[in-house]
Amino acid sequence: METSQETSLFLVKILEELDSKQNTVSYQDLCKSLCARFDLSQLAKLRSVLFYTACLDPNFPATLFKDKMKCTVNNQQSKKIMVAADIVTIFNLIQMNGGAAKEKLPTGRQKVRKKEASFESCRSDTEICNAAECEPLNCELSERSFSRGYPIRQSSKCRKMDCKDCPQFVPASEPNFLLGVSKEVKNRAASLDRLQALAPYSVTSPQPCEMQRTYFPMNIENESISDQDSLPINQSIKETFISNEEPFVVQSCVQKRNIFKEDFHNLMAVSPSLVGPISKAENEHREPQSRKEPHKPPFFNHSFEMPYNSQYLNPVYSPVPDKRRAKHESLDDLQASTYFGPTPVMGTQEARRCLGKPNKQTPWPAKSWSLNTEEVPDFERSFFNRNPSEEKLHYPNASSQTPNFPAPERRPTYLVPKDQQPILPIAYAAKQNGLKSKEISSPVDLEKHEPVKKFKDKSINCTSGQLSSDTSSVGTQTEHVLEPKKCRDLCTSGQGKYSDRHTMKHSDDDSEIVSDDISDIFRFLDDMSISGSTGVIQSSCYNSTGSLSQLHKSDCDSSPEHNLTKIANGVPNSKGDKGNRPENTHHSEEELKTSVCKLVLRIGEIERKLESLSGVRDEISQVLGKLNKLDQKMQQPEKVSVQIDLNSLTSEGPSDDSASPRMFHAHSGSHGPKLENNPDWCCSDASGSNSESLRVKALKKSLFTRPSSRSLTEENSATESKIASISNSPRDWRTITYTNRVGLNEEEIKDTGPGDNKDWHRKSKEADRQYDIPPQHRLPKQPKDGFLVEQVFSPHPYPASLKAHMKSNPLYTDMRLTELAEVKRGQPSWTIEEYARNAGDKGKLTALDLQTQESLNPNNLEYWMEDIYTPGYDSLLKRKEAEFRRAKVCKIAALIAAAACTVILVIVVPICTMKS
């Protein structure tokens, strides 16, 4: 005790120093000061405490610090600096974010409280609150809090003992308000809003302090600060933290918690009775671990006191009437309660119902917690994991005490309206919203994981069914009843995981889950469900929390609630639970889930962006098709005058005239919307953008480098043939159309003969420019298959509809002008040498010069169509040129021969004849 007390005082000292220097000393200086003045072990303990305290805040980015908590650096100095930096950062985050974490810090002086809150955070918000109350009383609860034991009720002794000794609560505005806890603390809410919320619990609990403990299910003792850095905290330490009345946390957090408690108490006023029995059983189980807290009945309060509770229950976040308010109204609500966070009121009401029925768990405890069986708040996890007995008490033993209530209260409290039922992995699954008591009683079996599974089967089926019927099941359980197996898995894995997983894992997972923007997650789920789901499993960012668990997008319904329902029903969690059941794999699996969830969210964002493009692409394809038709009509005179039989070349490309803009539209429709739903779509889209940039560059270069002697149409034909062979891409119709036109041009060229080659080349160039899209198809000719694929499947850099507006659009106009200015359309480069040689001429043309050029005339399709460097056509062009040269030589030779013959016939023959 002496050592623990000293440690507690020491930690409090550090926190006080941080608080005093927070606004006056730089971050680096604070870190240096901590490193210089404290040992690594001390700093590590403090970091652990702060981390778990901060984890109470759903907004806390636990994932950023989770790995660091486990980081093993050989260099002690470096590790010390890292730990100090983490301490300062976490401390600042707690101060800025306030909420449950900050409220917990005020247990002693607010700083001390903060540290204590860290321990308490390990316990639970409720416990922290209790600890805060008891801590002012120097209750054993403090020890329990630090020990991270859910036995917040254990702290009831402290409550009893300390409450007697503890001074009256100070005004809530005073950071030390938590310190002075007394039976009056029932009205402590007056001084501490969150305590006020507890006051209703206090009604059931002997003292507000007890209420708080009861309200905060997690005891630091039981939970241990963290699995790695569990900081054994004896009562003295807790008392020390408690004794420190320095306001460590901003009142706003406390007020939020108070508000939450008020709302919660509105719902949980009846729950104390429920909590009482449950808490008693839990306390009994916990007593070995920590002192029994007869007032543990408020265990629901503890669960409600969850870090999320303060925010969710806070009137600010979800006033009793507003607890059901828009899920997205409050990030805190959303994060803490996941998708159902905003429904605390109903949850509370249901919690009351549950309280009325000891077997029923209050859905309030943690909506997201109930949803995320695996991701229960640290205090819940510790509550379940700190001691197997506690776990049993809370989850498995919940049945004995209506254990569902203790844990479910924590979770269901939030979930009760919607989430709790699906969220309740086991006992929670037991209809917390008035689910059958037997469902809740089944948690007794839950103590036994198999019975828990059974319970899951029943209760989850019932839960999903009944919960769906139940108001608390609102979107979650009404949507889908988990399959018995899934429910079992969810519950079993949830409880097993809770009990098996270390508090730290729970807190870390919860923190990670909570740290994500739940509103974004739900929007993503909505998008995914609307888009048809990418088929990617949403790893349970909020597995246990219920915010997000592994949801197969196929499982996702149109509404995030539906998705959550499935999650709550354990559909995603069942898989996650199965995968996570091994304790050794749970943590990494949770991290993987978190990363996958983030990836899915990112994909969802991209998809949403792409969705807006699908319509545009369709329109562009249509416009482009029309432009191609018009262009063909315009080119008909040229074709008639200059028909070259290059169709042989174009014949290579399938003349899929059927591939009309409509076909392209269809393709875009199929690929666009489908791709949007498919992760590949993002890739294809990205490749499309890349290809576009490549095309733009190629266009610029090709504009300069193409020799007039070569026929762009020939290139287009060859390219089109390749493209056609490659795939029936949305652009195939463009390619085909262009190919046909090119074929005509080639025929014209052949018919025209070498003399008309220049004109034909000029016309073909114009045509090519007009058909800038076909050049894109030509790009596939390039050696790089990837680029070709991009060209084929990616959207055109200048869709017809887009080009129609390019003239007026400064973005496209400038780009076009720049490209034109850089390149004189005279000589496309057909070889790398030519390309490199002509590249230097890009910047020669000025804007005025460009404007004077016919190709730069916006009224001319050539203005909208640019040539692309197509090295693949070198051989083709050379072959053609060779043929033309041979034809010329043959003609010349023929002429010479004819002349010679004529001379012979005209001169020689007559002479000979005359001679003869």
Curated annotation (Swiss-Prot):
Residues 913-916 are extracellular. Residues 553-564, 575-591, 750-771 have a biased composition (Basic and acidic residues). Residues 1-891 are cytoplasmic. One of its GO terms (biological process) is negative regulation of angiogenesis. The modification Phosphoserine is found at S711. It holds the Pfam family MINAR1_C. The keyword Transmembrane applies. Residues 390-409, 553-591, 648-675, 705-726, 745-782 are annotated as: Disordered. GO terms for cellular component: plasma membrane. It is found in: Cell membrane. InterPro entries: MINAR1-like (IPR039706), MINAR1-like_C (IPR009626), MINAR1_N (IPR055117). The chain crosses the membrane at residues 892-912. It is a single-pass type IV membrane protein. Widely expressed, including in breast epithelial cells and endothelial cells (at protein level). Expression is down-regulated in advanced breast tumors (at protein level). Keywords: Angiogenesis, Cell membrane, Membrane, Phosphoprotein, Transmembrane, Transmembrane helix. Its main location: membrane. Interacts with NOTCH2; this interaction increases MINAR1 stability. Interacts (via N-terminus) with DEPTOR (via PDZ domain); this interaction may stabilize DEPTOR protein by impairing its ubiquitination. Intrinsically disordered protein which may negatively regulate mTOR signaling pathway by stabilizing the mTOR complex component DEPTOR. Negatively regulates angiogenesis. Negatively regulates cell growth. Negatively regulates neurite outgrowth in hippocampal neurons. Belongs to the MINAR family. This is Major intrinsically disordered Notch2-binding receptor 1. The gene is MINAR1.
